[in-house]
Structures are given as C-alpha cells and as structure tokens.
Curated annotation (Swiss-Prot):
Membrane topology: Peripheral membrane protein
Domain remark from Swiss-Prot or TrEMBL: Consists of a typical ABC-ATPase domain, comprising two subdomains, connected by a linker region to a C-terminal domain of unknown function.
A cellular component term, taken from the record's GO annotations: ATP-binding cassette (ABC) transporter complex, substrate-binding subunit-containing
Cystine bridges: none
Name this protein carries in UniProt: Glucose import ATP-binding protein GlcV
Role, per record: Part of the ABC transporter complex GlcSTUV involved in glucose uptake. Responsible for energy coupling to the transport system. In vitro, as a free subunit, exhibits a constitutive ATPase activity.
Assigned protein family: Belongs to the ABC transporter superfamily.
Compartments, as annotated in UniProt: Cell membrane
Positions contributing to ATP binding: 40-46, 89, 166
SUPFAM superfamilies: MOP-like, P-loop containing nucleoside triphosphate hydrolases
Matches recorded under InterPro entries: AAA+_ATPase, ABC-Glucose_import_ATPase, ABC_transporter-like_ATP-bd, ABC_transporter-like_CS, ABC_transpr_FbpC, ABC_transpr_MalK/UgpC-like, GlcV_C, Mo/tungstate-bd_C_term_dom
Organism: Saccharolobus solfataricus (strain ATCC 35092 / DSM 1617 / JCM 11322 / P2) (Sulfolobus solfataricus)
ABC transporter domain mapped to chain residues: 4-241
Length: 353
C-alpha cells in the first residue's frame, strides 16, 4: 500500500500552448480504490503517466507516502523504483510468450531463482483463476483470460500501487461486470492501492470508493460515486456520470419556467439550467398521490421507442421545444398530453453562465 499526494500539478505541451493538467490536487489514501473519470482529452492519460513516472509534471509535486518522486519538471524516482503495477487498455501481452512467460516477464531482471519465479507466478495465477492456462499463448485465450494474465503480470512483483488504464474497454459488455468484480475482489484481498482511469462511469463506479472528475485538465469534483451522481457541481459533470435531461429555463418568482413546466427551485440568476435524470421523471394521465413526486406541469408525447424491456418516452413541454425523456414499463401514444411529475429532492439546478 502507498499514499499518493498530488500537489499543484500542471502539465503543458507545445511550449505552454496545450494545458493537459491544470493545478491538480489529490490525496489518495493507503489501500484506497480511487477512480479518475473524464471525457476524451480531459488529461486522464497524462495524469496516469505522471503517477507511473512515464512523464513529469511541468510544475507541482508528486509524493509516494512522504517521498518526493517528481517535482517541477524533474524525475526524482524512476518508474522501476516506484513499486507500480500497470494494466493497459490493450493489455500489451507478448504474442510469442506463453501466459506463464508473460506473467513472469517483470521478474526476469530480479535476482530470483527459476523456482522462486515459478512459485510466485503460480501463486498469482491461482488468485486470478488462470493456473490452468499458464502454458497457453495469448491467441489461445479468451478476452477475459487475456485480461487476467495482464492483471497477474501487474501484480507479480507485489506492487504497492496498481494502475488500470481503461481496463475493460476491450471486453464485450457481458464480461465487464465479472471483470470489474474480479478487480475489486483482488484489490481487497491484496490491500494494494488502486487507481483506475476511464471515460466510462460504469467502470469507475463499480470499483472506486472515491472518484475525481477531470474536465479540460482541471479536477472539478471529488467525492463518493453516489455523491457525484446526486450532487454534481455542473451539468457537464452530471452528463458525464449518467443520462440526464438538460433544460434551460427562465427564473421567476415561481421557480424556473420551461414552457408549461414550473420547477419550484430558487436561483439567483435570470436564467438557469434544470437537470433531471430520467428515473426521476414520471408521466401520467392521472393525478399521482405520492408526496415524493411533485407535479411540474403538462407535456405532449413526441417520440416513443422500445429498448431493453422498457419504453423510452420523449415529451416536450407545452409552449416549448425543449425535450425530456424518461423510461416506462407501459407505452403512451405519440401526441397524447400527460402530467409531468418529478422527484422533488432530485431536481438539480445550475446557473446559466
């Protein structure tokens, strides 16, 4: 285990014209599972490379526990001395080596006997349930088995920190849940500090105890997954984390008005953006007698589609072209007027810049 301290780290390229990281500060605790979430170009890979020692911060400092490992453009502790294991997006297995040889590769430059190497490889392979494929080449393995070999190779030197870079993007959807569960189980068993980087919130939320959101090189929010989902600092963060309706409205004494809809919230600016997740919207032809739901007005069904056992229904408020979508277990015909309800404690309000 190791504690990672990132202090005022910035990274610029092309003589300062491209800012990849902008004054990032993070503390990752011993044994913590920490996730970095962000869109393409947010600086996630640059952040990972600085942690790994493959790049250095232009300004700022990086500590492993109390040890300064990089500072202001200088590499103080090289990658091989940081006790890091990495799993890349492509897994990067050597096609001409068996699974055993791939896993053992990081040990070849260490002063270990063949018996010690064999014992360590088999120990890690057993944890990951791949001991029966150690003599197979990567081309003979399934995608899930290849990923386990890559994970075993990262763990074979008993690292203090495990870095995962978009680790599940090459797996098909049906295998991802089990792969995420495996990573979490192995981390808990070994107690290694874990940093996972991904653009997919499902990857991050399934593994991480805390999450940092990177947008255009800035760390804009850090918190538990459920806190980020329910209380995002911006509509951009909200949309990164999950599906959300984004509605721009006018602020009045009655709240935020969007056509025929009125959201009873307080905002200091003249215009505001309402964010409401599809599961927090309910459409009905009848009055709903449930205090957790509030009526915000009427809308007209514009589009209805069927996906995954549910109907995806898109409506427009009367007198507005804004669109709101939600999911329902029963269809509502296009063109019908409906009452629009929302969960009153789930309305998200963002000031319009």
């Amino acid at each position: 285990m190791v504690r990672i301290i990132v202090k005022n780290v910035s990274k610029v390229f092309k003589k300062g014209k491209v800012v990849a990281l902008d004054n990032v500060n993070i503390n990752i605790e011993n044994g913590e599972r920490f996730g970095i979430l962000g869109p393409s170009g947010a600086g996630k890979t640059t952040f990972m490379r600085i942690i790994a020692g493959l790049d250095v911060p232009s300004t700022g400092e990086l500590y492993f526990d109390d040890r300064l490992v990089a500072s202001n453009g200088k590499l103080i502790v090289p990658p091989e001395d940081r006790k890091i294991g990495m799993v890349f997006q492509t897994w990067a297995l050597y096609p001409n080596l068996t699974a055993f040889e791939n896993i053992a590769f990081p040990l070849t430059n260490m002063k270990m006997s063949k018996e010690e190497i064999r014992k360590r490889v088999e120990e890690v392979a057993k944890i990951l349930d791949i001991h029966h494929v150690l003599n197979h080449f990567p081309r003979e393995l399934s995608g899930g088995q290849q990923q386990r070999v890559a994970l075993a190779r990262a763990l074979v030197k008993d690292p203090s920190l495990l870095l995962l870079d978009e680790p599940f993007s090459n797996l098909d959807a049906r295998m991802r849940d089990s792969a995420r569960a495996l990573v979490k189980e192995v981390q808990s068993r070994l107690g290694v500090t874990l940093l996972v980087v991904s653009h997919d919130p499902a990857d991050i939320f399934a593994i991480a105890d805390r999450v940092g959101v990177l947008v255009k090189g800035k760390l804009v929010q850090v918190g538990k997954p459920e806190d980020l989902y329910d209380n995002p600092v911006s509509i951009q963060v909200a949309s990164l984390i999950g599906e959300i309706n984004e509605l721009e409205g006018k602020v009045t004494n009655e709240g935020v008005v969007i056509g025929s809809l009125r959201f009873p919230v307080s905002v200091s600016s003249d215009r505001a953006i309402i964010g409401i997740r599809p599961e927090d919207v309910k459409l009905s032809k009848d009055v709903i007698k449930d205090d957790s739901w509030i009526l915000v007005g009427k809308g007209k069904v514009k589009v209805i589609g069927y996906q995954g056992g549910l109907f995806r229904i898109t409506i427009t408020p009367l007198d507005s072209e804004e669109e709101i979508f939600t999911y329902s277990d029963h269809p509502i015909h296009s063109g019908e007027e409906v009452l629009v309800y929302v969960r009153k404690d789930k309305i998200k309000v963002f000031e319009k810049n």
